[in-house]
UniProtKB/Swiss-Prot annotation:
Glycans are attached at residue 124. This is Expansin-like A4. PROSITE patterns: EXPANSIN_CBD, EXPANSIN_EG45. The lineage of its organism: Eukaryota, Viridiplantae, Streptophyta, Embryophyta, Tracheophyta. It is found in: Secreted. Coiled coil: none annotated. GO terms for biological process: plant-type cell wall loosening. Keywords: Glycoprotein, Secreted, Signal. Residues 188-281 form the Expansin-like CBD domain. Residues 59-173 form the Expansin-like EG45 domain. Belongs to the expansin family. Expansin-like A subfamily.
Amino acid sequence: MDDNGDVHFCHRATAVVALLLLHLVVVANAAAHSCDWCTPRHSTVSILPTPTHAAHLTGGACGFGAAPMELNVAAVTADLFRHGHACGACYQLRCRDRRLCGEDGVKVVVADMAKQPEQEGEMNRTAGGSLQFRITEDAFAAMAKQGVSAHELTRQRTLEVDFRRIPCEYRESRRLAVRVEEASRNPTHLAIRFLYQGGQTDIAAVEIAQANATPPSSSYYSSWRYMTRRDGAPGVWTTSRAPVGPLRLRVVVTAGSGGKWLRSDGEVLPADWRPGEVYDTGLRVTDVAVRSCSLSCAIQDMDSDDGEEEELR
């Protein structure tokens, strides 16, 4: 086999491996999140310590920075944070004390990982659960039922809640965006983070390519480069082999089971893309998982003492 044949064979082999890895990622993702769409699970929620507020959270482990989130932000403990996979996921929390709390609860988006001091862990063991959500005082007060003052609820500091994952809903003009991380170096080293990921979804794969390459040219197919999640920061996608810009991108979006490609129509990153900048992809993510609860989900969620818990609807 000549040198050109070797190169083409290597390209084909790399593509096959990438597709196999993508399949495994999508399947694993579906299995891990299938129970997110079922009946609500039980947890506790507490108020973030003063003077922590929303700006501190958006600068936390998820690295959203100064980007306006439009939703109440929350920090979650490690088991729910999932090494960063939960960044940008939306949840509905409803206090279980009907004397104090209303039916609608509060909707939050995950922006940080909550650290749990030893004394708080002890407090929540006696409360019957592990601390999983921390929210701002304003978000905590939003759970109060009509006729209950914000002060009356917030003085509780910690409450037991039902929680479930829900679709993220941003205003109509808000589309999926990418933030170029500070560690990026134009042109080859690129690290990005997604913002305003709507629906009830996870991003399972990301690829970038030169925006000026069009099918059926060979450069269109050969210029696509896959990105990988950064170790220790799954919300960041990175590559050291980025093509010269301007760049377009495509992503695999999963919603509980299966996945689909979404591809930008044109340029997303300009040739002179810069670290710290946010760029609009032109894509709108609205997929919602089909509510089909497996037996394993039902067993996982049947943790009440009397077996007659009210389902969060």
